[in-house]
């Protein structure tokens, strides 16, 4: 088993980190750059920043936040939200981000995945897939979970891999923010359908849930927000738990 990555997720709105349940009822969790520094010290393997209103409100990411974060942390970080063009990607990567995450724009213009991979390399391109269960399958949503696409999540995952995505960030909207555990059935279905790494997102409430995502869901990395922001568990506590259950993690 390859080393598994633990990734705190920072949902950003109006320059602040927020968290809600099922993509609603957002509450303030702090300054993104300060939180990034904190998680770097805590032993996080990577960070993901998602500007959760950028796509819906048709506005680009604040480059200033990217530059400040790049100057403050030593771990890789991904930026998503409002990225619609190759020039958007270039601006964010040039400002210091290691990867860009695209979601709504990838569905509307799948060629953006292929072009981004060609220009910057697949390792820089993460495709985020937000989905809900429907009639025994999973349906893809865009625009921050507000717009249903009719796409099947597993088929879409295979398509983004074919187009050149380097990773998939897979969020169960049903589980998001509930702290009841990841949708391991969804994770396993997508992980077995593609060769590229799948990052589990949505539902972490305790270290056991991250273990389930890795073992049952076959995830390559696990992303969590509430349990870390609220200091229910620290990154190091989660890593110690996973290591104690035979899962390889980076311990400093």
UniProtKB/Swiss-Prot annotation:
Q: Which residues cross the membrane?
A: none
- Enumerate the active-site residues: 11, 130
Q: Where in the cell is it found?
A: Cytoplasm
One GO term under biological process is:
L-histidine biosynthetic process
Which pathway does it take part in? Amino-acid biosynthesis; L-histidine biosynthesis; L-histidine from 5-phospho-alpha-D-ribose 1-diphosphate: step 5/9
State where it is primarily located: cytoplasm
> What InterPro entries does the annotation carry?
Aldolase_TIM, His_biosynth, HisF, IGPS_HisA/HisF, RibuloseP-bd_barrel
Cite the entry's keywords alphabetically.
Amino-acid biosynthesis, Cytoplasm, Histidine biosynthesis, Lyase
- Fetch the Pfam families from UniProt: His_biosynth
Q: Single GO cellular component annotation?
A: cytoplasm
The EC number(s) this enzyme carries: 4.3.2.10
| SUPFAM superfamilies the record matches | Ribulose-phoshate binding barrel
| Gene3D superfamilies according to UniProt | Aldolase class I
- Tell me, what is one Gene Ontology molecular-function annotation carried by this entry? imidazoleglycerol-phosphate synthase activity
Record field: catalytic activity: 5-[(5-phospho-1-deoxy-D-ribulos-1-ylimino)methylamino]-1-(5-phospho-beta-D-ribosyl)imidazole-4-carboxamide + L-glutamine = D-erythro-1-(imidazol-4-yl)glycerol 3-phosphate + 5-amino-1-(5-phospho-beta-D-ribosyl)imidazole-4-carboxamide + L-glutamate + H(+)
Protein family: Belongs to the HisA/HisF family.
Role: IGPS catalyzes the conversion of PRFAR and glutamine to IGP, AICAR and glutamate. The HisF subunit catalyzes the cyclization activity that produces IGP and AICAR from PRFAR using the ammonia provided by the HisH subunit.
Relate the assembly described in the record.
Heterodimer of HisH and HisF.
- Output this protein's name: Imidazole glycerol phosphate synthase subunit HisF
* Organism of provenance: Halothermothrix orenii (strain H 168 / OCM 544 / DSM 9562)
Q: Which gene encodes it?
A: hisF
């Amino acid at each position: 088993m390859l080393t598994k990555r633990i990734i705190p997720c920072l949902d950003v709105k109006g320059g602040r980190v927020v968290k809600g349940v099922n993509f609603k009822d957002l509450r303030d969790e702090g300054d993104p750059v300060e939180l990034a520094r904190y998680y770097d010290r805590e032993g996080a393997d990577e960070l993901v920043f998602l500007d959760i209103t950028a796509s819906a409100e048709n506005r680009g990411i604040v480059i200033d936040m990217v530059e400040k974060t790049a100057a403050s942390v030593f771990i890789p970080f991904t930026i998503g939200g409002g990225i619609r063009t190759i020039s958007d990607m270039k601006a964010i990567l040039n400002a210091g981000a290691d990867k860009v995450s695209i979601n709504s724009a990838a569905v509307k213009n799948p060629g953006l995945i292929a072009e981004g991979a060609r220009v910057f390399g697949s390792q820089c391109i993460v495709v985020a897939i937000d989905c809900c269960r429907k009639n025994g399958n999973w349906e893809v949503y865009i625009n921050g979970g507000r717009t249903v696409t009719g796409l099947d999540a597993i088929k879409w995952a295979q398509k983004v891999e074919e187009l050149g995505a380097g990773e998939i960030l897979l969020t169960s909207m049903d589980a998001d923010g509930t702290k009841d555990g990841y949708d391991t059935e969804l994770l396993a279905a997508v992980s077995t359908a593609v060769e590229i790494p799948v990052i589990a997102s949505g539902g972490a409430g305790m270290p056991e849930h991250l273990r389930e995502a890795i073992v049952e869901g076959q995830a390559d990395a696990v992303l969590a927000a509430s349990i870390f922001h609220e200091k229910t568990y620290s990154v190091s506590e989660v890593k110690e738990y996973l290591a104690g259950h035979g899962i390889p993690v980076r311990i400093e």
